[in-house]
A protein has these predicted regions:
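N-terminal membrane-anchoring/stem segments of glycan-assembly enzymes
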Residues: 1-41, 94
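Short, acidic, metal-binding catalytic loop of nucleotide-sugar glycosyltransferases
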Residues: 63-74
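Cell-envelope/extracellular polymer assembly enzymes that use nucleotide-activated donors
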Residues: 43-46, 76
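A conserved acidic beta->alpha catalytic loop
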Residues: 81-89, 104-106, 140
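Conserved donor nucleotide-binding strand/loop of the catalytic core
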Residues: 74-75, 89-120, 124-127
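Acidic donor-binding/catalytic loop of UDP-sugar-dependent glycosyltransferases
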Residues: 87, 135-152
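Acidic helix N-cap motif at the loop->helix transition within catalytic regions
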Residues: 59, 86-93, 144
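Single conserved hydrophobic/aromatic residue that forms the stacking wall/gate
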Residues: 162-173
Length: 173
Protein backbone atom coordinates (compact mmCIF):
# COMPACT_ATOMS: atom_id res chain seq x y z
CA UNK A 1 0.00 0.00 0.00
CA UNK A 2 2.86 2.38 0.78
CA UNK A 3 4.30 1.72 -2.68
CA UNK A 4 1.04 2.84 -4.33
CA UNK A 5 0.96 5.99 -2.20
CA UNK A 6 4.55 6.77 -3.19
CA UNK A 7 3.84 6.20 -6.89
CA UNK A 8 0.69 8.33 -6.64
CA UNK A 9 2.65 11.11 -4.89
CA UNK A 10 5.41 11.05 -7.54
CA UNK A 11 2.84 11.26 -10.35
CA UNK A 12 1.08 14.15 -8.57
CA UNK A 13 4.39 16.02 -8.19
CA UNK A 14 5.21 15.50 -11.88
CA UNK A 15 1.80 16.86 -12.94
CA UNK A 16 2.15 19.77 -10.50
CA UNK A 17 5.56 20.70 -11.92
CA UNK A 18 4.36 20.33 -15.51
CA UNK A 19 1.28 22.53 -15.11
CA UNK A 20 2.27 25.10 -12.48
CA UNK A 21 3.75 27.50 -15.05
CA UNK A 22 0.29 27.86 -16.60
CA UNK A 23 -0.88 29.75 -13.52
CA UNK A 24 1.53 32.52 -14.54
CA UNK A 25 -0.72 33.24 -17.55
CA UNK A 26 -3.80 34.01 -15.45
CA UNK A 27 -2.83 37.62 -14.53
CA UNK A 28 -1.47 38.48 -18.00
CA UNK A 29 -4.67 40.18 -19.27
CA UNK A 30 -4.65 42.51 -16.26
CA UNK A 31 -0.94 43.31 -16.51
CA UNK A 32 -0.86 44.05 -20.23
CA UNK A 33 -0.75 47.74 -21.03
CA UNK A 34 -3.04 49.10 -23.70
CA UNK A 35 -1.28 50.33 -26.80
CA UNK A 36 -1.82 53.99 -27.46
CA UNK A 37 -3.72 54.66 -30.65
CA UNK A 38 -2.38 57.93 -31.95
CA UNK A 39 -3.44 59.54 -35.16
CA UNK A 40 -3.37 57.22 -38.15
CA UNK A 41 -0.50 57.76 -40.57
CA UNK A 42 -0.85 57.92 -44.33
CA UNK A 43 0.58 54.52 -45.22
CA UNK A 44 1.00 53.21 -48.75
CA UNK A 45 -0.65 49.84 -49.25
CA UNK A 46 -0.58 47.21 -51.95
CA UNK A 47 -3.62 45.01 -52.35
CA UNK A 48 -2.71 41.55 -53.64
CA UNK A 49 -5.36 39.45 -55.33
CA UNK A 50 -4.55 36.05 -56.81
CA UNK A 51 -7.36 34.92 -59.06
CA UNK A 52 -8.02 31.88 -61.20
CA UNK A 53 -11.05 32.06 -63.47
CA UNK A 54 -12.77 34.71 -61.34
CA UNK A 55 -14.10 37.00 -64.07
CA UNK A 56 -17.61 36.96 -62.54
CA UNK A 57 -16.58 38.35 -59.13
CA UNK A 58 -13.25 40.17 -59.38
CA UNK A 59 -14.84 43.36 -60.67
CA UNK A 60 -16.95 43.60 -57.49
CA UNK A 61 -13.85 43.39 -55.27
CA UNK A 62 -11.96 46.00 -57.27
CA UNK A 63 -15.01 48.29 -57.25
CA UNK A 64 -15.22 47.94 -53.46
CA UNK A 65 -11.51 48.79 -53.22
CA UNK A 66 -11.99 51.83 -55.48
CA UNK A 67 -14.89 52.91 -53.27
CA UNK A 68 -12.81 52.98 -50.08
CA UNK A 69 -12.80 56.08 -47.88
CA UNK A 70 -9.00 55.70 -47.68
CA UNK A 71 -7.02 57.85 -50.12
CA UNK A 72 -6.81 56.12 -53.51
CA UNK A 73 -3.38 57.68 -54.11
CA UNK A 74 -2.05 55.53 -51.25
CA UNK A 75 -3.64 52.31 -52.49
CA UNK A 76 -2.32 50.15 -55.35
CA UNK A 77 -4.30 47.13 -56.51
CA UNK A 78 -2.46 44.17 -58.03
CA UNK A 79 -4.16 41.17 -59.57
CA UNK A 80 -2.41 37.99 -60.61
CA UNK A 81 -4.47 36.10 -63.17
CA UNK A 82 -3.09 32.65 -62.38
CA UNK A 83 -3.52 30.02 -65.10
CA UNK A 84 -6.79 31.64 -66.17
CA UNK A 85 -8.79 30.32 -69.08
CA UNK A 86 -11.40 33.09 -68.89
CA UNK A 87 -11.32 36.90 -69.03
CA UNK A 88 -10.24 37.54 -65.42
CA UNK A 89 -7.21 39.60 -66.50
CA UNK A 90 -9.25 41.77 -68.86
CA UNK A 91 -12.00 42.42 -66.30
CA UNK A 92 -9.39 43.38 -63.68
CA UNK A 93 -7.60 45.73 -66.12
CA UNK A 94 -10.84 47.43 -67.11
CA UNK A 95 -11.66 47.87 -63.41
CA UNK A 96 -8.33 49.67 -62.91
CA UNK A 97 -6.04 47.07 -61.36
CA UNK A 98 -2.39 46.43 -62.21
CA UNK A 99 -2.58 42.96 -63.73
CA UNK A 100 0.07 40.27 -64.06
CA UNK A 101 -0.56 36.96 -65.76
CA UNK A 102 1.07 33.65 -64.95
CA UNK A 103 0.85 30.36 -66.79
CA UNK A 104 2.62 27.59 -64.92
CA UNK A 105 1.04 24.14 -64.74
CA UNK A 106 3.81 22.73 -62.52
CA UNK A 107 3.86 25.22 -59.65
CA UNK A 108 0.16 25.44 -58.98
CA UNK A 109 -1.45 27.10 -55.98
CA UNK A 110 -1.85 30.36 -54.11
CA UNK A 111 1.58 30.18 -52.47
CA UNK A 112 3.34 30.05 -55.83
CA UNK A 113 1.05 32.73 -57.19
CA UNK A 114 1.72 35.10 -54.28
CA UNK A 115 5.46 34.51 -54.60
CA UNK A 116 5.32 35.30 -58.32
CA UNK A 117 3.28 38.45 -57.69
CA UNK A 118 5.44 39.78 -54.85
CA UNK A 119 8.64 39.22 -56.85
CA UNK A 120 7.22 41.24 -59.77
CA UNK A 121 5.97 44.00 -57.47
CA UNK A 122 9.42 44.27 -55.83
CA UNK A 123 11.03 44.57 -59.26
CA UNK A 124 8.49 47.03 -60.68
CA UNK A 125 7.99 49.14 -57.53
CA UNK A 126 11.41 49.43 -55.84
CA UNK A 127 10.17 51.98 -53.28
CA UNK A 128 7.90 49.28 -51.90
CA UNK A 129 4.86 49.68 -49.70
CA UNK A 130 4.23 50.15 -46.00
CA UNK A 131 1.84 47.22 -45.85
CA UNK A 132 0.00 44.60 -47.86
CA UNK A 133 -3.52 43.27 -47.99
CA UNK A 134 -4.25 39.84 -49.45
CA UNK A 135 -7.80 39.13 -50.58
CA UNK A 136 -9.59 36.38 -52.41
CA UNK A 137 -11.22 37.54 -55.62
CA UNK A 138 -14.73 36.87 -54.32
CA UNK A 139 -14.43 39.27 -51.34
CA UNK A 140 -16.25 42.60 -51.16
CA UNK A 141 -15.20 45.19 -48.57
CA UNK A 142 -17.10 47.72 -46.51
CA UNK A 143 -16.21 51.27 -47.61
CA UNK A 144 -14.13 52.06 -44.50
CA UNK A 145 -12.27 48.74 -44.31
CA UNK A 146 -8.81 50.01 -45.40
CA UNK A 147 -9.16 53.16 -43.29
CA UNK A 148 -9.93 51.13 -40.17
CA UNK A 149 -7.15 48.63 -40.85
CA UNK A 150 -4.76 51.55 -41.35
CA UNK A 151 -5.68 52.83 -37.88
CA UNK A 152 -4.83 49.42 -36.43
CA UNK A 153 -1.53 49.30 -38.36
CA UNK A 154 -0.67 52.86 -37.32
CA UNK A 155 -1.34 51.86 -33.72
CA UNK A 156 1.61 49.49 -33.80
CA UNK A 157 0.05 46.21 -34.82
CA UNK A 158 2.05 44.76 -37.69
CA UNK A 159 -0.18 41.83 -38.54
CA UNK A 160 -3.90 41.47 -38.60
CA UNK A 161 -5.77 38.36 -39.61
CA UNK A 162 -9.46 38.01 -40.15
CA UNK A 163 -11.17 34.64 -40.17
CA UNK A 164 -14.67 34.62 -41.57
CA UNK A 165 -16.58 31.74 -39.98
CA UNK A 166 -19.95 32.76 -41.43
CA UNK A 167 -19.10 34.33 -44.77
CA UNK A 168 -21.20 37.12 -46.16
CA UNK A 169 -20.59 39.25 -49.21
CA UNK A 170 -19.28 42.20 -47.15
CA UNK A 171 -16.05 42.11 -45.12
CA UNK A 172 -16.13 44.53 -42.22
CA UNK A 173 -14.26 45.10 -38.96
Amino acid sequence: METLKTINFVIAVIFFVCYTYQFLYIPVPWLRKARPHGPAKDNRYAVLICARNEQRVIGDLIASLRGQTYSQSLLSIFVLADNCTDDTAMVARVAGANVYERFNQVQVGKGYALDFLTQHIKADYPDGFDGYFVFDADNVLSPDYIERMNAVFSGGYELSLIHISEPTRLLSI
